[in-house]
């Protein structure tokens, strides 16, 4: 601890991101990136924006992208918030909407950034246990709270909560903000954005990193009632008025407009996921139902940490979590057929 630190910094437990190896020959199945490239129209839009205008600040409101998102989801632009990746959007949500006297509620197995944000902003929280099938029990959230947040599909399990159960949670807490974190929704679920006009306490977050193949661009969004969006804008403009650069604005807008590319790559990921599930089950793995671009699997005869280490020795990287309830699972990102073949060959050697 440095004498120059603010006192609270020594108590922070930072988020640990998935490994980004420098060696390109590795088969990288650990951070849920899309194996297929972004929309060619998005790439062309960004190339066209490489002009002398880069000397100018970008639009602080990102109106081009904001209107593209609003048109896509059939909402008003003042119902859309944009940030530098969904992690920044989530950080602003925790700061703007969850600092109350009661405890914030979220699942015991969920996105590990949630407790990090709570520590950063001094938010009390309670983790609600998933059931034995790693599913949310909606009735467990019908209790006093400072807000509710959960990933759907779940990260890291990939399990999907049906929209009827999502709505049950929202209805039970009309005086609290309910955030549905939909980073992976496009790979097998129905978005809760269809509910935002009915529930002023609902906020839905998404990212362009997964189904739009733009993880390197850092674009996240939230959709909800304009009152919630205003709170986020106030926090954003007290922190960084220009979170999205010119490339993100034009590239993100073009990605939303290119529905054909989106549908094509999404369908390829889903087909590859189902094929990999069958192949892993054929090798004795137990695989949880997944609505995401990854699967969560365990083998009854092999320790998960040891499997991950041995796969790495063979040039294949997957994600292992040390958390007690899931310590025997591996999270495996959906890749190309060639990457899956390398994974399966590595497992055969083990």
UniProtKB/Swiss-Prot annotation:
Q: For this chain's UniProt record, which GO biological process terms are given?
A: L-histidine biosynthetic process
GO molecular function annotations of the record = histidinol-phosphate transaminase activity; pyridoxal phosphate binding
Write out the catalysed reaction.
L-histidinol phosphate + 2-oxoglutarate = 3-(imidazol-4-yl)-2-oxopropyl phosphate + L-glutamate
Q: Which cofactor does it need?
A: pyridoxal 5'-phosphate
Disulfide connectivity? none
> Which E.C. number(s) belong to this protein?
2.6.1.9
Q: Name one Pfam family in it.
A: Aminotran_1_2
This protein's pathway reads: Amino-acid biosynthesis; L-histidine biosynthesis; L-histidine from 5-phospho-alpha-D-ribose 1-diphosphate: step 7/9
> Is-annotated flag, keyword Cell inner membrane?
no
Tell me which Gene3D superfamilies the record gives. Answer: Aspartate Aminotransferase, domain 1 (3.90.1150.10), Type I PLP-dependent aspartate aminotransferase-like (Major domain) (3.40.640.10)
Q: Which residues carry this modification: N6-(pyridoxal phosphate)lysine?
A: 210
State the similarity comment.
Answer: Belongs to the class-II pyridoxal-phosphate-dependent aminotransferase family. Histidinol-phosphate aminotransferase subfamily.
Query: What is the name of this protein?
Result: Histidinol-phosphate aminotransferase
Organism the protein comes from: Pseudomonas savastanoi pv. phaseolicola (strain 1448A / Race 6)
Give the gene symbol.
Answer: hisC
């Amino acid at each position: 601890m440095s004498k120059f630190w603010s006192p609270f910094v020594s108590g922070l437990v930072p988020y640990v991101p998935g490994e980004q190896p420098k060696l390109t020959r590795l088969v990288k199945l650990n951070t849920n990136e899309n194996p297929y490239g972004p929309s060619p129209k998005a790439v062309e839009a960004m190339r066209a924006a490489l002009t002398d205008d880069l000397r100018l600040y970008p639009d602080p409101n990102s109106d081009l992208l904001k209107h593209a998102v609003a048109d896509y989801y059939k909402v008003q632009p003042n119902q859309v918030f944009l940030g530098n990746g969904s992690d920044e959007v989530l950080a602003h949500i925790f700061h703007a909407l969850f600092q109350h006297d009661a405890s914030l509620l979220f699942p015991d197995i969920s996105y590990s950034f949630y407790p990090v944000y709570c520590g950063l902003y001094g938010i009390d929280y309670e983790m609600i246990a998933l059931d034995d099938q790693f599913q949310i029990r909606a009735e467990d959230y019908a209790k006093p709270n400072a807000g509710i947040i959960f990933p759907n599909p779940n990260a890291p399990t990939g399990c999907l909560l049906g929209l009827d159960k999502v709505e049950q949670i929202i209805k039970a807490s009309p005086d609290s903000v309910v955030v549905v974190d939909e980073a992976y929704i496009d790979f097998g679920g129905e978005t809760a954005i269809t509910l935002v006009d009915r529930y002023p306490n609902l906020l839905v977050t998404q990212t362009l990193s997964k189904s739009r193949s733009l993880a390197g661009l850092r674009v996240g969004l939230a959709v909800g009632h304009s009152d919630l969006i205003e709170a986020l804008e106030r926090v954003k403009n007290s922190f960084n008025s220009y979170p999205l650069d010119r490339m993100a604005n034009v590239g993100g807008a073009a990605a939303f407009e290119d529905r054909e590319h989106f549908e094509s790559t999404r369908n390829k990921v889903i087909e590859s996921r189902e094929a990999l599930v069958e192949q892993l089950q054929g090798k004795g793995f137990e695989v949880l139902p997944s609505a995401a671009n990854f699967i969560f699997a365990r083998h009854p005869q092999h320790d998960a940490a040891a499997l991950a280490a041995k796969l790495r020795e063979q040039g294949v990287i997957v994600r292992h979590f040390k958390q007690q309830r899931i310590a025997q699972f591996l999270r495996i990102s959906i890749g190309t057929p060639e990457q899956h073949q390398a994974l399966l060959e590595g497992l055969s050697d083990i």
